[in-house]
Amino acid sequence: PNSKVLTTKTRAAGHKYSNIFHVPDDTGMFQIVRLRSGNNIPISIENTTILHKSIQNVEQIDFQVYSLYDMFSINKIHIHTIRHVFSSSRTYNTFARLLGLEEGSPIVSIEIISSTKDGLVAEHTEVMVVPAFAKYYTDGIIRNGEFRLSSQLF
């Protein structure tokens, strides 16, 4: 798979990201929107937001080459928990065109929130996945009276 950066920008957290990251509305955030493809076939669009201060010189990093998680590691941010929320939606306009889909086509939507051991949110990503590439497996286990659900996207 390869990655094409569609846009990057620095912005204020605003209401949405201040609630997700538990920071004031005017906190600086960095946003990366990437198109993921395999063999020149669009797979997904990822809209990732991180705290601007979390990665040194973040504007200068080529995220088509370097992994966000490598940059976290270099900047001593250790991800402890990754939460995925799967839902369905439809895609329109530019996103539909980039994914090679018709207007209003269904997609699988995944919200990803990565946190450190201290519970600090390091990343929020919204992913729109072409259904042909959105197969996932879930498994539920009851252990000591507690239900645990795991899932895997493949």
Pin down the residues of each PLM region.
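C-terminal all-alpha effector/ligand-binding and dimerization domain
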Residues: 2-154
